């Protein structure tokens, strides 16, 4: 039996990292500082990609490793794939 895993790196993160390929509709169990929750995946998620573990409003930070890694360009629901199609970077050109 294949064991599929996700990792929440820091308590303040609003995204998980997928350590397996997942299909939409699968359920992942997540340990949060507020208690364990189950998240139903709304999208197919490839190994190494991010999954929203909390609702993220458009313009809000994407937090991984306890640090902001970008901002949501649209609302992201719990269980959605978080990637370049719904995240913008915070880098500014000089």
Give the role of each language-model region.
Residues 2-94:
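N-terminal small-residue-enriched
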């Amino acid at each position: 039996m294949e064991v599929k895993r996700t990792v929440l790196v820091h308590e303040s993160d609003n995204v998980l990292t997928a350590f397996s390929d997942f299909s939409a509709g699968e359920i992942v169990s997540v340990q949060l500082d507020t208690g364990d929750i189950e998240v139903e995946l709304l999208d197919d998620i490839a190994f190494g990609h991010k999954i929203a573990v909390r609702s993220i409003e458009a313009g809000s930070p994407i937090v991984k490793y306890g640090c902001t890694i970008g901002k949501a360009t649209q609302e992201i629901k719990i269980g959605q794939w978080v990637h370049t199609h719904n995240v913008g970077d915070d880098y500014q050109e000089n």
